[in-house]
Amino acid sequence: MVNFNQFLKQAQSMQKKMQEAQEQMANARYTGKAGGGLVEIIITGKGEVAKISIDESLLKSEEKEMLEDLIKVAFNDAKQKCDEDSQNSLSGALNGMSLPPGFKMPF
């Protein structure tokens, strides 16, 4: 059986690692590109759009629909990178944490 004091120390360590991972994620930036770089979106680790860059060649009215699609693709690309990094950071924070039998984390 796991010593309760040892478990509490592990939980405190995990909490600290989780806070560090969350701070790291909040400061991270992820770039999504579409159309070979014609559209570029940078998002924060919180999934908020920080910047959008659009090549001038796409600013013609006949390119409107394509531009809308490229913005969507670029955002989804950046969001996927953010989600993957977030998952990896949180997994790393939990690494080495041994939980007592039957104890489940809420995520």
Swiss-Prot record:
Belongs to the YbaB/EbfC family. GO terms for molecular function: DNA binding. Gene3D superfamilies: Nucleoid-associated protein YbaB-like domain. Binds to DNA and alters its conformation. May be involved in regulation of gene expression, nucleoid organization and DNA protection. This is Nucleoid-associated protein A1C_06705. Keywords: Cytoplasm, DNA-binding. It comes from the Bacteria. NCBIfam families: DNA_YbaB_EbfC. Its main location: cytoplasm. SUPFAM superfamilies: YbaB-like. Pfam families: YbaB_DNA_bd (PF02575). It comes from Rickettsia akari (strain Hartford). PANTHER family: NUCLEOID-ASSOCIATED PROTEIN YBAB. GO terms for cellular component: bacterial nucleoid; cytosol. Homodimer. It is found in: Cytoplasm, Nucleoid. InterPro entries: YbaB-like_sf, YbaB/EbfC.
